[in-house]
C-alpha cells in the first residue's frame, strides 16, 4: 500500500484506497501490513505541513498499516524526521530508508552517515531501496558490512531486477549480514519486479541463513498470480529480459513503464531512446538526485519536454522550478547554476527544512473540504480519510469523490486533430512482432499490408488571424489562467497542463491578445493539439 497505489486508485481506478488497505488487513489480520511513505511528501508530489503528516500516519495506522517505510527522494533526512516521529507516536514500525543511487558524490561513507542519522531519529529498522537495480553485488557486500558495523537496528533490502543483478546482489548482501529482503513470487518477478522468492529460498537452502519456508506451499500462489498477470498484460512494459541501459540512465522499472505508456499516448514512442539518453543529463543538472517518486516524475517529465520540444529547457515545469528553489530539500550536489537562474531568477533559495516554512494546515483543509463539497453538492462524507485525499490531491481527489459511483468517468478519451503525420510502431502480440504504420491519410499498414482505419478528429484545425499555440506534449488541461480577449505579456502563463502527474505551464510566446481558447479544464490532449490563439 502507499507509494503510487493511492494516486492510481483515485486517478485511474475509481477505487477507495482506504477501503483497499482495510480489506487486505481483514483478509490477513496476523500479517503486518507495510506501506511506502514519501516522508514529508506523504503520497503526493509536494511537501505537506507537519500536522497533515501526523494525521495521515495516524489514519493509516487505524486503517491497517503496521510498518511504515519512510523515504525522501533527495535523501534529505530532515524530510523524513516528522514522518518517522509520527509513526513512533502511533506505535507503528518506523523504517527509515536510503534511496540508493550512484554518482560522483554518492559514496559508501555518505550512505553510512545517512543511515546513522536515520537511526538517531529513532527508526526501528533501515531499508536500502534500490529502485533501479543499480546496487552491484560486491558494493552491496561492502555497504551492508559497514552498516552492520555502525548500526544497531536491522537492515532490510529492496532491489529491483531490471539490470539483472538483483539475485547476486541479494546473496552478497545476505552474506554480509542482511536481516530482511524483499522478493516477489516467481510468476510476478524479474524484469521490472524483484528476485523470485522461490529462487532465493533455494539458494539459501542448507546454509546458515536458511529461510525455513516450504517451497511446495508457494506453488499454488505462483500459479494463482500467473493467471492474474495475464489480465494485465496490456499494461506491461516492453522489457522481456535485462535492460543494461539503466546502468547509465538509472531509470527505475516503474519509471520505465510510465515513460513508455506516456510516450505511446503521445504518439512519440519512437523518441523513447532519446528520452532515456536525456534523463541522466537532466538528473546531473538537478544535482544528481535519485530517481524515485516524485523526483523520477520531475526528471522524466522535463526530459520528455526537452526531447519533444526540440529545445532543452525551453519550457521548465513548475516542479523543476520548485526543486531549483530548494522547496524539496537539499540536493546531493549543487544544481546547474545557469538552469537555476533561468528557472527561478533572483528568487531566494530555501536552505532550511522546507516544511518549517509551512503553517499547520489540516484544520483549514478540513474547512475548505466541507465548504467545497457543499458548494459542488458532492455526496461525500467529511471523514478524516476523505479530507486527507483532498489534502494531497485537491483536484483529482474531488473528481474521484464526485464520480466514485460512475465507472465510465475514469476512462478518458484523448482529443484528436486533423493534421496527422506518419507514425510507425513495433508492436508485440503473443511474442510475435508486427510493424504498424499510421499514415497521414488515415490509412494503416501492418507489416506493409494496407488496413482500413477511420479517424474522426474531435477538434478542427484552428482558423484565425492569430498564431495557434499547440500542446508540446500529451496530458490533461489542469487550469486556464486567462480568458478569451484578455491582453497578456510575453511569457505569461495561459494554461497549466498536467502530464505524467506533473504540472507544465503553457506560456504566451509574445505579448498580445488571447483569441480562441480551444480547450477547457479536464480535456485530454495530444502533442500538436491546438490550445489557444494569440494575436499581436
Task: Name each region found by the language model.
Residues 168, 193, 197, 201, ...:
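Core active-site phosphate/anionic-ligand binding loop and the adjoining beta-turn-alpha structural block
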Residues 2-114, 119, 126, 133-137:
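Active-site beta->alpha loop and helix N-cap motifs at the rims of alpha/beta catalytic domains
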Amino acid at each position: 500500500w502507499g507509494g503510487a497505489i493511492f494516486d492510481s486508485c483515485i486517478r485511474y481506478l475509481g477505487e477507495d484506497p482506504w477501503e483497499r488497505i482495510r480489506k487486505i488487513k481483514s483478509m490477513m489480520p496476523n500479517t503486518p501490513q507495510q506501506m511506502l511513505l514519501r516522508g514529508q511528501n506523504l503520497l503526493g508530489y509536494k511537501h505537506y505541513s507537519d500536522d497533515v503528516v501526523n494525521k495521515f500516519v495516524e489514519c493509516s495506522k487505524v486503517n491497517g498499516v503496521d510498518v511504515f517505510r519512510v523515504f525522501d527522494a533527495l535523501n534529505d533526512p530532515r524530510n523524513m524526521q516528522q514522518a518517522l516521529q509520527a509513526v513512533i507516536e502511533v506505535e507503528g514500525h518506523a523504517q527509515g530508508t536510503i534511496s540508493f543511487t550512484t554518482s560522483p558524490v554518492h559514496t559508501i561513507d555518505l550512505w553510512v552517515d545517512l543511515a546513522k542519522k536515520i537511526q538517531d531519529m529513532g527508526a526501528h529498522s533501515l531499508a536500502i531501496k534500490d529502485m533501479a537495480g543499480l546496487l552491484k553485488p560486491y558494493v552491496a557486500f561492502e555497504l551492508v558490512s559497514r552498516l552492520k558495523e555502525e548500526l544497531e537496528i536491522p537492515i532490510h533490502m529492496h532491489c529491483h531486477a531490471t539490470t539483472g543483478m538483483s539475485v547476486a546482489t541479494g546473496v552478497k548482501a545476505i552474506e554480509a549480514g542482511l536481516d530482511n529482503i524483499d522478493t516477489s513470487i516467481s510468476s510476478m518477478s524479474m524484469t521490472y519486479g524483484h528476485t523470485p522468492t522461490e529462487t532465493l529460498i533455494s539458494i539459501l537452502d542448507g546454509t546458515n541463513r536458511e529461510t525455513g519456508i516450504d517451497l511446495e506451499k508457494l506453488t499454488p500462489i505462483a500459479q494463482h498470480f500467473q493467471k492474474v498477470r495475464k489480465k494485465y498484460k496490456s499494461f506491461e512494459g516492453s522489457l522481456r529480459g535485462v535492460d543494461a541501459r539503466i546502468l547509465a540512465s538509472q531509470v527505475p522499472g516503474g519509471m520505465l513503464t510510465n515513460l513508455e505508456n506516456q510516450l505511446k499516448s503521445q504518439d512519440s514512442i519512437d523518441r523513447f531512446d532519446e528520452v532515456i539518453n536525456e534523463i541522466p543529463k537532466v538528473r546531473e543538472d538537478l544535482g544528481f538526485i535519485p530517481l524515485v517518486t516524485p523526483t523520477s516524475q520531475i526528471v522524466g517529465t522535463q526530459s520528455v519536454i526537452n526531447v519533444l520540444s526540440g529545445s532543452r529547457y525551453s519550457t521548465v515545469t513548475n516542479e523543476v522550478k520548485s526543486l531549483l528553489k530548494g522547496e524539496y530539500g537539499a540536493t546531493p550536489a549543487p544544481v546547474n547554476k545557469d538552469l537555476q537562474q533561468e528557472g527561478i531568477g533572483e528568487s531566494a533559495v530555501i536552505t532550511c527544512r522546507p516544511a518549517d516554512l509551512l503553517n499547520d494546515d489540516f484544520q483549514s483543509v478540513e474547512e475548505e473540504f466541507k465548504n467545497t463539497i457543499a458548494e459542488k453538492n458532492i455526496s461525500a462524507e467529511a471523514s478524516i480519510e476523505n479530507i486527507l485525499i483532498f489534502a494531497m490531491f485537491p483536484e483529482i481527489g474531488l473528481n474521484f469523490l464526485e464520480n466514485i459511483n460512475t465507472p465510465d468517468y475514469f476512462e478518458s478519451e484523448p482529443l484528436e486533430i486533423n493534421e496527422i503525420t506518419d507514425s510507425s510502431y513495433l508492436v508485440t502480440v503473443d511474442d510475435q512482432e508486427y510493424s504498424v504504420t499510421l499514415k497521414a491519410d488515415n490509412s494503416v499498414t501492418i507489416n506493409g499490408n494496407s488496413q482500413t482505419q477511420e479517424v474522426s478528429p474531435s477538434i478542427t484545425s484552428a482558423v484565425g488571424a492569430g498564431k495557434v499555440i499547440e500542446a508540446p506534449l500529451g496530458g490533461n488541461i489542469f487550469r486556464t489562467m486567462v480568458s478569451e480577449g484578455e491582453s497578456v505579456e510575453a511569457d505569461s502563463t495561459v494554461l497549466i497542463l498536467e502530464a505524467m502527474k506533473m504540472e507544465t505551464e503553457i506560456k504566451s510566446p509574445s505579448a498580445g491578445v488571447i483569441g480562441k481558447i480551444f480547450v477547457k479544464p479536464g480535456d485530454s490532449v495530444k502533442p500538436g493539439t491546438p490550445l489557444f490563439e494569440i494575436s499581436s
